[in-house]
Structure formats: C-alpha cells, structure tokens
Amino acid sequence: MYNILKKSFYKQKSLDVASSLLGKMLLFNQHKGIITETEAYIGQDDQAAHSFHGYTKRTAVMFGNPGFSYVYLIYGMYHCLNVVTEPEGFPAAILIRSIILLSKNTPHTKVNGPGKICKTLHITKEHNNIDMTANHSFCICNTNLNIDDYICTPRIGISKATDKFWRFVIPDVTSLQYIDTKLVPTLT
C-alpha cells in the first residue's frame, strides 16, 4: 500500500511544499516516478505566475483547494503538471519539472522538462482540476527516500520574476536512476 499526500501537506507554504516534494513519488495510472525538480508559483504578486493577472477561467483551479492538479498547455503543444498549494483562495501551485521514471529494470529513466513528463505519462488538460489527495491512480505519495541534498536556483523558462530562487533541484540524480524499487511504494 502507499501513503498518498494529504490536503494538509499541500495547504502549507508553497516553498515548503516545493522542497518537500523532492523524493516523493508521482503516480499516474501505471506510471510512477520520483520527483527530482520543482518550481513554485505563488500569489498574484508573482509576475511569472498565471495568477498574476487575477482570477480567470484558466486560473480558477489555482485559487481552489490545495492538492488539486493544475494542467495547462504552453506554446500550443506542451502540457505542464502543477499541484495547487496554500489555503483555498490564495493562488499558488508547484510545477513538476523533472522525475525519474521507475521501471522494472535499471537504470530508470530521467524525464526532464514538464512537457516531457506529461507526454511520457499521457497527462493532458483533461487531467486538470483533479483532487490528487483522493485519487489512487493520479496522486503523489510518500516514499522511504530522505532528500536532504537539494539546491535552490532561479526558475527557468520564464522572462519575469527571474530573481526568485523558487526552483528546487536534486543536483545529482544518478543514484536514483539505480534505486531499488522496494524503497518506494508499490501499486495495489
């Protein structure tokens, strides 16, 4: 059995959630991957966040309940997966930027880039606004991994608010590519 992250986890401050997601496992249907990179987008003052321009049909999920998926399309071709954070009414989300896709064989595959993650896992806009705290086929779970070694850098792929060190990265994921899958929960 596996331990799905609860709403209370996502209700915390976004920067705490972003760093704490490192080493957790993203489950989507039959796929599972260890999260190795995240970025935080926080509030209406964050010029790089979709919420900067206020509440819209597109950003409504960011203002909603913590723990819900926020999936959108960029450049008309790439889907990006975020999970909503902070209390309802405050717009914030964490972008999942990189994972180690687990398989029965090693080395496991590094999937870097939010568009590549969604393409590999087949996540699309139809997976937007799903409660990831109550869905056993689309969720994030605890693992037995302790990730203490991570770095904070400016967010990438944006042109505004580049001074914020809100990107969290496990600097060397080589060991995770050879991780024993017994250290992570199994699907039941």
From Swiss-Prot:
SUPFAM superfamilies: FMT C-terminal domain-like. The keyword Chaperone does not apply. Pfam families: Pur_DNA_glyco (PF02245). Keywords: DNA damage, DNA repair, Hydrolase. Its EC number is 3.2.2.-. It comes from the Bacteria. Coiled coil: none annotated. It is an enzyme of class 3 (hydrolase). GO terms for biological process: base-excision repair. NCBIfam families: 3mg (TIGR00567), PRK00802.1-4 (NF002004). Belongs to the DNA glycosylase MPG family. This is Putative 3-methyladenine DNA glycosylase. It comes from Ehrlichia ruminantium (Cowdria ruminantium). The lineage of its organism: Bacteria, Pseudomonadati, Pseudomonadota, Alphaproteobacteria, Rickettsiales.
